[in-house]
Amino acid sequence: MPKKKSPGTLAENRKARHDYNIEDTIEAGIVLQGTEIKSIRRGSANLKDSYAQVNRGEMFLNNMHIAPYEEGNRFNHDPRRSRKLLLHKREIAKLGERTREVGYSIVPLKLYLKHGHCKVLLGVARGKKKYDKRQALKEKAVQRDVAREMKARY
């Protein structure tokens, strides 16, 4: 059974937590067009395979898919366009330094509403090796079995 989303959460990148070790998180605003926010509020955003990148002192979110708004007209948005992220200059510089190190990248973890504004939770992540992923799955299965046994006993 899939996990329930917390209130306000519009999209979540659960695969990122499986593929990466998240070392640090930061909240960023996102620049959207009118039809994009309408589509996001309907729940048709997908963070899978998306990443953030520093370009000329600005940060952009690439490869995030937002389905076209159904009631939109011919001026609807491009589903996979690069979207600018709103961060302070020093935060962008700090994240840019971290991603210059080998093996680090910035991945979006969650898309949510906060006081009516759309926010993205970004994670500074280091990729897991294949054996790390297998080990994490084994540990998760053991914890699930222990929880099941404890529930059956009490």
From Swiss-Prot:
GO terms for molecular function: RNA binding. The keyword Cytoplasm applies. Keywords: Cytoplasm, RNA-binding. InterPro entries: SmpB, SsrA-bd_prot, SsrA-bd_prot_CS. Its main location: cytoplasm. It comes from the Bacteria. It is found in: Cytoplasm. Gene3D superfamilies: 2.40.280.10. GO terms for cellular component: cytosol. GO terms for biological process: trans-translation. CDD domains: SmpB. Pfam families: SmpB (PF01668). Required for rescue of stalled ribosomes mediated by trans-translation. Binds to transfer-messenger RNA (tmRNA), required for stable association of tmRNA with ribosomes. tmRNA and SmpB together mimic tRNA shape, replacing the anticodon stem-loop with SmpB. tmRNA is encoded by the ssrA gene; the 2 termini fold to resemble tRNA(Ala) and it encodes a 'tag peptide', a short internal open reading frame. During trans-translation Ala-aminoacylated tmRNA acts like a tRNA, entering the A-site of stalled ribosomes, displacing the stalled mRNA. PANTHER family: SSRA-BINDING PROTEIN, TMRNA-BINDING COMPONENT OF TRANS-TRANSLATION TAGGING COMPLEX. Belongs to the SmpB family. This is SsrA-binding protein. It comes from Staphylococcus saprophyticus subsp. saprophyticus (strain ATCC 15305 / DSM 20229 / NCIMB 8711 / NCTC 7292 / S-41). The gene is smpB.
